[in-house]
Structures are given as C-alpha cells and as structure tokens.
Amino acid sequence: MIGKEEKNMNETIKLRTARPDDAEELLKIYAPYVENTAITFEYEVPSVAEFRARIENTLKKYPYIVAERGGELLGYAYTGPFKSRAAYNWAAETSIYVKEGQKGLGLGRKLYEAIETISRMQNILNLNACIAYPKVDDEYLTKNSAQFHEHLGFKYVGEFHDCAYKFGRWYDMIWMELSLGEHMADPAAVVAFCDLDKRDVEKIM
C-alpha cells in the first residue's frame, strides 16, 4: 500500500533525461556521498566539468534520468557498460543517487523503474549493481543499498572482501543482478539510448 507521503511525491515528481547543463546541480547531490559516506569509493569530489563529461559520455549509449519537482533536482539514476568487451554488451551497470532528505519516499523506486523499462527497450538483458557493503553498519556505510536493490528484485551474486579502503577502514563490495529477459541464442542487438524513439521514452517518464 502506498503511503500518503509517497503518493504525494509520485503525483508531483517528474522524470526526464539529464542534460549536460544539469551537472552543477547533480554534483551537489553527489558530493555528500563522496565526502561523508563510503557508498561511493571516490575520494575527491569531481569538478563540474568532469561531471558534465560523465553525463555526456553516458548519454552516448545509456540512459541518464533525473527526478525533478518544482524545478529542483531530487535524484538521478543511470546505467553504463558492465565491462567494455563486446560480449558483455547485453549487461549494464546501474547507479543511483538521491538527494539528502529525500530518501524513503519512493523516489529511488521510481527512478529505477524508468531505468529498467528503458533498458528493456534497449534489449539489455542484465542489470548489475556494484554495491559498497560493510561487515557491520557504521557511520559511513550501511546495508541499506543492498536491501533496497533486493526489494526491487535484484539477487545477490557475489562478494569481494576488503577491496576498498576509505575513512581508515576496509569495505567489501557485492554484486547484485536483475534479469530482464530470456537469454536466447542470437539475441537482439542492443539499441543505444540516443537511438530510441524519444516519444516512447517520454511515455514512461
């Protein structure tokens, strides 16, 4: 059952494709994750120019979706290559970041549902999430991200132990995956996000 607060958010929130000019505002969402958490293993906040380049590079092939309400960007999600080799083409890695104070309201689910639908339109068959994972929850990292992905249907598939060092402690990393379709011989070619019919994309926003 959808709570009143979540219902109100879903009624007022709008999704759209990110634009390079969103870089500065999106970076304000991302920066606290770098500076205050181990959710991302980056040490330094990227520059606006670097973040803009990341958006532009992603949009060459993959979706980069932002959630907006009243002109304010509340979060974003995107996919990218799982690996660069051609045989991995039907798998994509997911990322999602929600603005501080906006978690627990259904925003993450809304963004991921759009990403999943678009990925199906692209003929992507696997969504893979690389998730920072603590042995024990601490002030920098909890197991919430893994639990969020599990609620969306992602399955745990593997773990790397003590592979990342941040804030003076070691963290694990887990992989979770969501299968989007049957893995047939001679699968349909993957369609770049920029080549999808924009009208079809807008319908799911």
Task: Tell what function each PLM region has.
Residues 95-103, 131-136:
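A short, internal acetyl-CoA/4′-phosphopantetheine-binding micro-motif in the GNAT/acyltransferase core
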Residues 119-144:
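Conserved GNAT acetyl-CoA-binding A-motif
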Residues 104-120, 143-147:
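Conserved acetyl-CoA-binding loop-helix of GNAT-fold acetyltransferases
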Residues 78-81, 130-132, 146, 150-169, ...:
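Conserved catalytic-core motifs of GNAT/GCN5-like acyltransferases
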Residues 162-205:
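C-terminal "cap" of GNAT-fold acetyltransferases
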Residues 27, 31-54:
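Conserved GNAT-fold acetyl-CoA-binding loop/helix
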Residues 14-26:
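A short beta-loop-alpha structural element at the N-terminal edge
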Residues 45-91, 95-101, 113, 118, ...:
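Acetyl-CoA-dependent GNAT
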